[in-house]
């Protein structure tokens, strides 16, 4: 497991990496490279694994989707989505309920300080900071690309 700053990845960014979705995958690949170098810790919700499987099995096939998710599990810390997170998400007025679940899943880890997403305006600033992959990487001196 990687060390360093602990960041939460929204499902879209993980999918960019796993499915090599252009032009977004460059930034997603760079995030995973930092994790592989133990410069950051990537966190992903349990909910993302289900969503990713659903999408990846349509893009590829079920076996390849599972293989990609097994590799992903070796690179990330999985955050919880339980009763408390569902209750908190239901109590908010997010445009997208899945984003609310992601937000409260990220908050289960006290030292996650940012969600990396391509939909940063879907996350209320008063709950958690959200940045695009480009914004996050632009601030880092250890990103060599």
Please state what every model-predicted region is.
Residues 1-44, 57-64, 125, 131, ...:
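Short, well-structured N-terminal submotif of metal-dependent ribonuclease cores
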């Amino acid at each position: 497991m990687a060390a360093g700053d602990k960041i939460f990845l929204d499902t879209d960014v993980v999918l960019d990496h796993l499915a090599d979705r252009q032009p977004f995958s460059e930034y997603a690949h760079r995030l995973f490279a930092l994790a592989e170098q133990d410069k950051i810790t990537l966190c992903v919700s349990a909910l993302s694994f289900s969503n990713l499987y659903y999408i990846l099995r349509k893009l590829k096939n079920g076996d390849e989707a599972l293989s990609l998710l097994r590799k992903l599990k070796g690179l990330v810390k999985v955050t919880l989505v339980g009763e408390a997170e569902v209750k908190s998400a239901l109590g908010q007025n997010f445009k997208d309920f899945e984003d609310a679940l992601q937000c409260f899943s990220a908050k289960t880890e006290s030292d996650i300080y940012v969600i990396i997403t391509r939909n940063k305006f879907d996350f209320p600033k008063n709950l958690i900071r959200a940045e695009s992959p480009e914004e996050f990487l632009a601030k880092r001196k250890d990103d060599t690309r």
